[in-house]
């Protein structure tokens, strides 16, 4: 298990050489802990996408083009030296694709390829654990609440820059209630 009851580390495993039992074990661990960390993999796109398919149904990210036609589920998220605005998710608490009304992915997979020194500071939290620690009075006040999730906001700026570079027509904000 990781720090603060969020996540688990899986060590001494090669994702390129897994049988279905090991894949199921990884998926069960992910479901139990919410986040898993598997280091030192350096997967090629084929292996990465196949692993994703082995633990769930990949969904095409609606805001960017996939790596190519063969790998529509893989997106390159990068921070360029010329970027002046906040990057995807940088400095803001967020939930990936929570602004989708339907077909929200169950999991998000990240793989760092080039992480500058002093970067790579993604932090994970558990809404389930936070809720469980609330006083009963607050729980009763929010139990029937509905959240409004939007793809707009300060962190959208870098995404809009990438859309422009890729020749993607600037996308409208997406919003959903859950």
Regions found by a protein language model. Give the residues of each.
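Non-heme Fe(II) oxygenase catalytic core, chiefly the N-lobe of the double-stranded beta-helix
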Residues: 1-178
């Amino acid at each position: 298990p990781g720090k603060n009851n969020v996540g688990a580390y899986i060590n001494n495993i090669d994702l390129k050489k897994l049988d279905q039992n090991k894949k199921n074990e990884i998926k069960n661990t992910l479901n139990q802990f919410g986040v898993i960390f598997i280091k030192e993999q350096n997967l090629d796109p084929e292996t990465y996408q196949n692993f994703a398919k082995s633990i769930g149904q990949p969904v095409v990210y609606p805001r960017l083009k996939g790596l190519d036609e063969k790998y529509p589920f893989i997106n390159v998220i990068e921070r360029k030296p010329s970027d002046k605005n906040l990057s995807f998710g940088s400095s803001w608490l967020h939930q990936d694709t929570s602004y989708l009304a339907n077909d929200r992915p169950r999991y998000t997979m990240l793989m760092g390829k080039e992480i500058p020194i002093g970067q790579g500071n993604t932090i994970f939290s558990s809404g389930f654990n936070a809720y469980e620690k609330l006083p009963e009075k607050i729980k009763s006040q929010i139990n029937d609440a509905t959240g409004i999730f939007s793809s707009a906001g300060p962190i959208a700026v870098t995404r809009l820059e990438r859309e422009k570079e890729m020749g993607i027509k600037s996308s409208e904000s997406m919003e959903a209630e859950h």
